[in-house]
Amino acid sequence: MSFEKSVGAVVFRKEEDEVFFLLLHYISGHWDFPKGHVEEGESEHETLRREVQEETGIRDLGIISGFKRNIFYSYRPGGKEREKKKGVAHIIKKVVYYAAETESVEIGLSHEHKGFEWLPYDEAIGRITHDNGKNILLKANIFLKKKK
């Protein structure tokens, strides 16, 4: 068994009185938030900024203090990952999520994605593929409403 840590961002923007959340359509078919592995020597905030910029081109992120949530899941490595991690049958993954605001609307997608959407909460919660992501969005939405 192996352990991995990633950092993700619930990226949102405000337009008048409405909040729009950024969801990425991954090549594998699922919809989720930008996220990625922590590189050696990086802080969580550095990872968040790097991953969001690499995956979307967004540079003007304001990380919202007070929102930090963790999810855990396990999976079996496949394909190239299986070759790199010979002998590892199971990976336990921790993803730390932050909320981050942007004023950017245009996105420069990375090769990892085939699309994106800026969606209001009610549509975003239905679009996210995995229950962990839905739960993070629910918590972020509640947090942002209280912060108004």
Q: Where on the chain are the PLM-derived regions?
A:
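Residue-level signal for short segments within beta-strands and strand-turn junctions
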Residues: 11-13, 25-26, 101-102
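NUDIX/MutT-family hydrolases
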Residues: 96-101, 106-138
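C-terminal alpha-helix
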Residues: 139-146
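Conserved Nudix-box catalytic region and its N-terminal flanking loop in Nudix hydrolases
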Residues: 18-61
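Conserved N-terminal beta-strand and adjoining loop/helix that marks the start
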Residues: 1-21
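Short aromatic/basic micro-patch
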Residues: 32, 92, 118
